[in-house]
From Swiss-Prot:
Keywords: Cytoplasm, Glycosyltransferase, Purine salvage, Transferase. This is Adenine phosphoribosyltransferase. GO terms for molecular function: adenine binding; adenine phosphoribosyltransferase activity; AMP binding. Belongs to the purine/pyrimidine phosphoribosyltransferase family. It is an enzyme of class 2 (transferase). SUPFAM superfamilies: PRTase-like. It is found in: Cytoplasm. Homodimer. Its EC number is 2.4.2.7. It comes from Brachyspira hyodysenteriae (strain ATCC 49526 / WA1). NCBIfam families: apt, PRK02304.1-2, PRK02304.1-3, PRK02304.1-5. The keyword Nucleotidyltransferase does not apply. GO terms for cellular component: cytoplasm.
Length: 170
């Protein structure tokens, strides 16, 4: 199955000059969605994983489905004010400025094995922020998995010390 056939390309979104890779069309197709999750699971099937950590919002969609497939827990990473309990945070760079991600401070215990998951890796900033939070809690990052990689933005370089798995490259 050619997964690129299920990704909609939207020119000039969210701003002029950007070609947005829209995964909603893949998610809508039950066969393509199942195939993508199955293939992502195959890429890391040899790893023992306690948790998948995924950032809102599309990371929740891919990460929770993958956690179900791998029979492990899912830990949501959110923006400020969205988690009800005490949190840790990590700032990361955006194209113009910075943002901050948050995770519950008791989400991971020392030595627990974690896979970082998101729908897409571009600059690597979101993935690196999630990795740093896992390591603050003394978890072990076993790698990362992404549905899509935008290769020209070289985000893989930010997290090259960890295994990176990708299904679709642009």
């Amino acid at each position: 199955m050619e997964l690129k056939d299920y990704i909609r390309n939207i020119q000039d979104y969210p701003k002029k000059g950007i070609l947005f890779r829209d995964i909603t069309t893949l998610l809508q197709n039950k066969d393509a969605f199942k195939y993508a999750i199955d293939k992502m699971a195959e890429q890391i099937s040899s790893e023992k994983i306690d948790y998948i950590v995924g950032a809102e919002s599309r990371g929740f969609l891919i990460g929770s489905a993958l956690a179900y497939k791998l029979n492990c827990g899912f830990i949501p990473v959110r923006k400020k004010g969205k988690l009800p309990y005490k949190t840790i945070s990590e700032e990361y760079a955006l194209e113009y400025g910075t943002d901050t991600l948050y995770m519950h401070e008791d989400a991971i215990k020392k030595g627990e094995r974690v896979l970082i998951v998101d729908d897409l890796i571009a600059t690597g900033g979101t993935a690196l922020a999630m990795i740093k939070m896992v390591e603050k809690l003394e978890g072990i990052v076993v790698g990362s998995s992404f549905l899509i990689e935008l290769k020209e933005l070289n985000g893989r370089k930010e997290i090259e010390k960890y295994p990176v798995n990708v299904l679709i490259e642009y």
